[in-house]
């Protein structure tokens, strides 16, 4: 008796997620060929389409294994299967050309050079030995070279580089790790490096290997070189050369702001900073962010110039993430050269990173002594990402850009197609539809035409790559923000204007997957946010969900002399705080001594008559004021300088002193602020709020200073006082509302000491604490909150 014949079946499988440009089709091909199945795989605008045919058991095995071990850069977010009629085909499984059709897929971020490519780079016997653009399906640029979707070479900035026969063979071989690697190249087919010296430097232009050798020699000689990377230009110099670092700092007008440092390898990084296992993992990850680390007190064999990160216990380190970086820092056998380089964004302070080659020669003229450039265009600017690692091993991203963008975030509620324009500082837009949101790259400040042009370019690029056509715009409520005016010009009708601190809280809620059915206690501390009453907010505790909020507590307002321009003068902020608290400007007080007699007279008149003095409840401004009062920072050369110096001082006394300065916590009726929101059934909403009055803090601080208490102790006691005030108010709120989830958000919570202490006190009190992780707590994460508030309105209307 013969066994029954098993009829073949055919199954159509659609895979969604980050599945293009990552070697997913060769992976599918190997699976199918290993099971002797027939059919095909193809890229489409929706993801990857597979049709597979063969014995039912083998087709089932194929489907089961499909998501078990995908390529390293792949992320599968959805798999759809349906049976279709078998065709009776018997040929081999094939990889078909990409289908051109409307739809959406996910492009991976740019990733660091993989170990296999690094081995080829260093191997004299390999045809890509010292090739500055070596890459494969497991590494290299993606987002910054993509000009459209689906992701194929014609839709990248590699379209102008025809493949040589050898590269074409690799590109077409499913068994090769360069199969359909769109940026694949070699010395024969380009791109090519070039070194362009500044006029009068006495150095001749060079190409290829000579360009790299000349750039290394210039860096070793103390020169500043503009280096074109994947997402823009860096300005580089030898980080151990005090004169070179001082020159770069002076040319860039950077004040005392710390520089990031690129180390040749992990061993070098370990000599400069103390690394935990989690910090080591972040530093060596494919994302290759800048990681903020504790500096070693006595570095082993490598000493950074003092001006790299002056007066800071931390240093931002990153490792090479392109072959150009690896070659600049030197391969074994190369002539001696710097093993640590300052790598700072190629721009003047306050401007966006430069990406265009012609612009680089003009905008960076006077900053760089030479340009190490290449002829592969950059489709979108993408600055380095920045993060710190908490003691528990979790990450707090402070700038979300290269290595993260355009990876989508999963949303807890569906949103209408919406574009949120963020804020004017640390600008990053957010585009969303359905249950996904995409951040654009970090743009920075929108204070000039270059910043606005970069934001518009980022918007066009992200819209093109995601396939989202926004129908709604969301923006900050501040009427003077460039980002708000930009939203009004998008042609999407009147933008939905979202209060600044409500957006911060909504951003954290979305990151943690909260659906908003239960409000949270949102602690939103920053320097500046436009308040409902037209004043400057920033020391806020709100009851909030996505539909609205109620202002529960605030920092006692004080005048902000000169408005936004006064922020650069912490000494004036300090004196305004003393004035608001009824405390005298005593001779010998650091903030008084920092001002001229004329300045003091004008400031006194301003405060008395209320001239150009907008009230502010900004917690960030209080940190600035205290920094001046203890004698640390009176004139800020960059954003948050005063607060950073205060945190650095507090760190040195943190374990030795456990004191805390007490805030006055008083009930306040008519606190003002809020929008209609859905009060949960059975929950009470406080009719009145509280005020956090810093007058007792200031009195205690001045008393301790008169007793010659060390500045670090003063700083530590202030930090603990803020944390205890927050914990006290959150406990009171729980007692009155029954709410138990607290969100910590806003730029002030980038302060590691404050965030850790506040979270610890709240956790001890039995409250659930949500902190930012992949989404920045500062204005770099603002657009996600705007998106959620505006984009979910239709969802809430149907409930």
Please tell me what each predicted stretch does.
Residues 1-183, 187-194:
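Intrinsically disordered, low-complexity, mixed-charge
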Residues 83, 232-297:
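A phosphate-binding glycine/aspartate-rich beta-alpha loop in the early core of alpha/beta enzymes
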Residues 226, 467-479, 737-748:
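Short glycine-rich phosphate-binding loop at a beta-alpha junction
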Residues 270-276, 327, 353-358, 384-385, ...:
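Conserved phosphate-binding catalytic cores of ATP/NTP-utilizing and phosphoryl-transfer enzymes
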Residues 493-504, 740-745, 752, 758-782:
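Conserved phosphate-binding/catalytic loops in two-lobed NTP-binding clefts
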Residues 501-525, 530-531, 570-579, 770-799:
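Glycine-rich phosphate-binding/hydrolytic loop that grips phosphoryl groups
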């Amino acid at each position: 008796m013969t066994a029954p014949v098993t009829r073949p079946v055919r199954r159509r499988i659609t895979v969604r997620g980050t599945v293009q440009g990552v070697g997913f089709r060769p992976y599918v091909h190997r699976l199918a060929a290993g099971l002797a199945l027939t059919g095909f795989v193809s890229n489409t605008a929706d993801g990857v389409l597979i049709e597979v045919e063969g014995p039912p058991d083998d087709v089932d095995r194929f489907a089961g294994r499909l998501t078990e071990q995908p390529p390293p850069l792949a992320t599968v977010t959805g798999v759809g299967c349906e049976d279709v009629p078998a065709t009776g085909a018997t040929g081999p499984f094939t990889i078909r050309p990409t289908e051109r059709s409307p739809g959406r897929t996910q492009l991976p971020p740019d990733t660091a050079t993989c170990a296999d490519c690094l081995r080829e780079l260093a191997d004299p016997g390999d045809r890509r030995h010292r090739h500055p653009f070596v890459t494969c399906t497991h590494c290299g640029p993606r987002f910054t070279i993509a000009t459209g979707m689906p992701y194929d070479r014609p839709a990248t900035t590699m379209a102008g580089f025809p493949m040589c026969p050898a590269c074409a063979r690799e590109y077409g071989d499913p068994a090769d790790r360069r199969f359909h690697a769109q940026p694949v190249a070699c010395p024969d087919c380009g791109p090519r490096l070039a070194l362009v010296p500044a006029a009068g430097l006495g150095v001749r232009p060079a190409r290829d290997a000579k360009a790299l050798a000349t750039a290394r020699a210039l860096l070793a000689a103390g020169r500043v070189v503009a280096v074109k990377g994947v997402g823009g230009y860096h300005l580089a110099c030898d980080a151990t050369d005090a004169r070179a670092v001082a020159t770069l700092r002076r040319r860039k007008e950077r004040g005392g702001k710390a520089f990031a440092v690129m180390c040749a390898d992990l061993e070098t990084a370990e000599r400069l900073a103390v690394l935990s296992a989690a910090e080591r993992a972040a530093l060596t990850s494919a994302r290759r962010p800048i990681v903020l680390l504790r500096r070693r007190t006595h570095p082993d064999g490598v000493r950074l110039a003092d001006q790299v990160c002056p007066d800071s216990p931390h240093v931002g380190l990153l490792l090479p993430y392109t072959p150009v970086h690896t070659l600049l820092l030197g391969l074994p056998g190369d002539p001696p050269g710097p093993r640590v380089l300052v790598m700072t964004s190629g721009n003047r302070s306050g401007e966006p990173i430069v990406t265009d080659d012609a612009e680089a020669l003009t905008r960076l003229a006077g900053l760089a002594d030479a340009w190490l450039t290449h002829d592969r265009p950059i489709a979108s600017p993408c600055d380095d990402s920045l993060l710190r690692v908490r003691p528990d091993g979790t990450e707090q991203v402070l700038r979300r850009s290269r290595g993260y963008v355009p990876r989508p975030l999963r949303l807890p509620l569906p949103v209408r197609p919406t574009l949120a324009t963020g804020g004017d500082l640390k600008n990053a837009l957010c585009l969303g539809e359905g249950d996904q949101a995409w951040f654009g790259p970090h743009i920075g400040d929108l204070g000039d035409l270059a910043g606005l042009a970069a934001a518009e370019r980022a918007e066009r690029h992200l819209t093109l790559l995601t396939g989202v056509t926004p129908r709604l715009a969301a923006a900050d409520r501040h009427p003077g923000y460039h980002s708000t005016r930009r939203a009004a010009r998008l042609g999407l009708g009147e933008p939905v204007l979202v209060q600044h601190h409500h957006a911060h809280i909504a951003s954290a809620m979305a990151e943690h997957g909260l659906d908003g059915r239960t409000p949270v206690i949102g602690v939103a501390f920053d320097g500046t946010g436009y308040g409902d009453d037209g004043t400057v907010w920033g020391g806020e505790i709100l009851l909030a969900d996505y539909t609205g909020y109620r202002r529960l507590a605030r920092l006692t307002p004080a005048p902000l002399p000169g408005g936004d321009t006064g922020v650069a003068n912490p000494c004036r902020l300090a004196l305004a705080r003393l004035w608001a608290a009824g405390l005298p400007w005593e001779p010998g007080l650091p903030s008084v001594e920092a001002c001229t007699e004329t300045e003091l007279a004008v400031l006194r008149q301003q405060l008395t008559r209320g001239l150009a003095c907008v009230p502010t409840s900004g917690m960030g401004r209080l940190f600035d004021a205290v920094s001046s009062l203890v004698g640390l920072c009176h004139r800020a050369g960059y954003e948050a300088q005063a607060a950073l110096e205060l945190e650095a001082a507090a760190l040195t006394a943190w374990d030795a002193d456990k004191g805390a300065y007490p805030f006055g916590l008083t009930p306040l009726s008519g606190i003002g602020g809020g929008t209609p929101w859905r009060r949960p059934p059975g929950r009470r909403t406080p009719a009145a709020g509280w005020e956090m009055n810093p007058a007792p803090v200031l009195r205690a601080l001045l008393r301790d200073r008169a007793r010659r208490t060390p500045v670090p102790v003063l700083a530590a006691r202030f930090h603990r006082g803020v944390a205890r005030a927050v914990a006290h108010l959150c406990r009171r709120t729980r007692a009155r509302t029954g709410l138990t989830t607290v969100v910590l958000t806003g730029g002030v919570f980038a302060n590691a000491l404050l965030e850790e202490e506040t979270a610890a006190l709240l956790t001890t009190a039995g409250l659930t604490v949500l902190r930012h992780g992949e989404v920045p707590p500062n204005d770099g994460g603002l657009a996600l909150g705007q998106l959620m508030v505006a984009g979910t309105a239709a969802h809430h209307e149907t409930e």
